[in-house]
C-alpha cells in the first residue's frame, strides 16, 4: 500500500482513498521482529499457546494513512476521501478490522511501535 500510494501520488494530481475502513496498519519488519522474538522464546523453553495478533499501535482509516504517507514524503497530490461503495473491489472489505494485540504484548513482552513511527521508518527504508 505504501509503495503504491507513493507512486500514485507522484503520478497523479488527485487521488481517491477509502475513508470508512478502519484498521491498524502493520509494518512487515515489525511483524518479522515480533515473530523472531516468539521463536527465540519458544527455543528458550517458554510455553506459548493460542492465537496471537500483531499490528502496529493506533487505529486509522486508509484515507488518514494515505494523508500521513503524503505528509512524510512531502508530496502535493490532492487526496479525496471516498466511501467503500465508491471503490468496489472483488473481495468485500470489513469496515472495522482492528486487531487486539494485548495478549502478545503481555505474554511475549513485546513493545509495539505506533503505525506512524513504523510508516516513517518504512518510507525512509524505501527511499
What label would you give each PLM region?
Residues 115-127:
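Amphipathic terminal alpha-helices
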Amino acid at each position: 500500500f505504501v509503495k503504491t500510494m507513493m507512486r500514485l501520488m507522484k503520478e497523479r494530481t488527485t487521488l481517491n482513498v477509502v475513508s470508512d475502513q478502519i484498521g491498524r496498519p502493520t509494518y512487515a519488519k515489525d511483524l518479522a521482529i515480533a515473530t523472531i522474538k516468539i521463536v527465540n522464546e519458544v527455543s528458550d523453553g517458554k510455553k506459548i499457546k493460542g492465537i496471537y495478533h500483531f499490528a502496529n499501535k493506533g487505529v486509522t482509516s486508509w484515507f488518514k494513512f494515505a494523508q500521513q504517507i503524503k505528509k512524510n514524503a512531502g508530496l502535493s497530490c490532492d487526496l479525496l476521501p471516498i466511501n467503500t461503495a465508491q471503490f468496489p473491489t472483488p473481495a468485500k472489505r470489513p469496515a472495522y478490522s482492528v486487531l487486539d494485540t494485548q495478549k502478545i504484548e503481555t505474554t511475549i513482552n513485546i513493545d509495539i511501535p505506533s503505525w506512524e513511527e513504523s510508516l516513517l521508518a518504512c518510507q525512509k527504508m524505501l527511499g
